[in-house]
Design a protein with these regions (language model features):
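Catalytic-core regions of core metabolic enzymes
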Residues: 1-453
């Protein structure tokens, strides 16, 4: 698996001079993403492509062979890579097991060739791998637009590892990662998984120092028991978005990756046993990854809803109770501090509504008082339209001093949104989603509020 995520040399089968072909895109992505290892192009015509020497057949072993050829030529390419001693190969073509029995037979042949050579095989019917590499990316995929890499691993999160059975879902993930400023460490599309499965990738990511949170998009689990056992051993949060839950979805999954979706009730029970967080929707999946990628898991369920917006604060409180969070009132000493700083009509319960009339200079101290309260293991911040710099500054400073996890909903205040985002505070698109993302970080909770064992 090291050769897949951290290769030192790469061969691109199907590399083409024709800019319209996917083999050209793949080679260009490898060359321009920031990978500084050895790159070889494999093309029957030989010569040179994009400044890289091209060979008709691989003459030496490389760590990773990226195979972008039609399905009919895939077996020959895999055999060539295996014969040269490659450690791993990724077959990006489609037209295999998802098409029926004949395609499944071709898949089986690919797996047989790889197994005989002790070469790991990803795919077929996948979109490739994206992995942090020094200050850039190993972009062994068809994705042409990736997030800007952090200046160093761990900065800006730099922490989420994604395994997806769907290549197109990877496009959704990278678009959301850019929009949410989500730190990304690794991405692997496993496709039809004739050899490398989501469980294999999960096991590798579990011990990867660059990955702190793991996300998985799956239409079905081919090795359900292996996956559950691997998830149980994993010491990192795992968030799963499971497709193919209903009859129509299961049929679509079968035609897409040639897999069986299984009974979702049994899948949910297995997730619960393994402590896996299951997201109910793609929005929830990305919300939870955003929260877990930016903040440490909350040590408990006691939370403060800190707001200057009455109605949205109540919505957040309703969601918190529904999801199993506790909303204790502040202790008497904390309440006195807040009352001394906020208007007399401020609500000093939970939610704690400082009101827009709070003197700007008082916001930092009042916010710090909330964060200092021992009953609160974390804080959910709500601000609808109050453009007072001291509010954002107070939240950032209090979070930095206490280290308590925070999620936020900020509406129509770009200056404060930017300040909180720069500080690594997850910004969600509604009060309820801010609460749900926080709840996923709380020990023993899932986004739906169901307790995990």
């Amino acid at each position: 698996m090291d050769a897949i995520f951290e290769p030192r040399s790469v061969a691109v089968y199907g590399a083409s001079r024709d800019e319209r072909k996917l083999g050209h895109t793949l080679l260009r992505n490898v060359l321009t993403g920031g990978f500084d290892g050895r790159v070889i192009a494999v093309n029957p015509s030989g010569g040179e492509i994009l400044g890289v020497r091209a060979v008709s057949a691989l003459e030496e072993a490389v760590d990773l062979a990226l195979i972008s050829v039609p399905a009919a030529s895939a077996s020959a390419a895999v055999a060539d890579a295996a014969g040269a001693g490659c450690r791993a190969a990724i077959v990006l073509a489609s037209g295999f097991g998802e098409t029926g029995p004949q395609g499944k037979a071709v898949e089986a042949r690919l797996a047989e060739i790889a197994r005989a050579a002790n070469m790991r095989l990803v795919g077929p019917n996948c979109i490739g791998v994206v992995s942090r590499h020094r200050d850039g990316w190993l972009n062994g995929s068809y994705f042409w637009r990736l997030p800007d890499p952090p200046r160093k691993v761990g900065e800006d999160g730099g922490s989420v590892g994604i395994v997806s059975q769907s290549g197109a879902f990877g496009g959704m993930f990278f678009a959301e990662a850019r929009r949410r400023r989500l730190g990304v460490a690794r991405f692997l599309s496993v496709g039809n998984s004739v050899d490398v499965t989501e469980s294999d990738a999960l096991e590798w990511l579990s011990s990867d120092p660059a990955t702190s949170v793991i996300g998985l998009f799956a239409e079905a689990f081919r090795e359900g028991r292996h996956f559950v056992a691997t998830a149980e051993r994993c010491q990192k949060p795992i968030v799963v978005l499971k497709a193919g839950k209903g009859g129509a979805g299961a049929r679509a999954a079968a035609s897409h990756t040639g897999s069986l979706a299984g009974r979702h009730g049994a899948v949910q029970a297995a997730f619960a046993r393994a402590g896996v967080i299951e997201a109910a929707s793609s929005d929830e999946f990305f919300d939870v990854l955003q929260a877990l990628g930016a903040i440490s898991p909350a040590p408990g369920r006691g939370v403060a809803v800190l707001t200057i917006s009455g109605g949205p604060g109540v919505l957040a409180s309703d969601a918190a109770e529904r999801l199993g969070l506790r909303l204790p009132p502040p202790g008497e000493w904390t309440a006195r501090r807040i009352r001394h700083l906020a208007p007399e009509f401020a609500a000093v319960g939970n939610p704690i509504d400082l009101t827009p009339q709070c003197p700007p200079a008082s916001f930092p101290a009042a916010i710090q008082a909330v964060f200092d309260e021992p009953a609160y293991q974390g804080v959910i911040v709500i601000n609808c339209g109050l453009d007072i710099p001291e509010f954002g500054q107070g939240v950032v400073a209090a979070r930095r001093r206490t280290g308590k996890p925070v999620t936020a909903f900020v509406l129509d205040v770009p200056r404060i949104e930017s300040e909180l985002a720069e500080a690594g505070i997850p910004l969600l698109s509604s009060p309820e989603r801010a609460v749900a993302a926080y709840a996923a970080t709380a020990r023993g909770l899932s986004p739906s509020g169901q307790g995990a064992p």
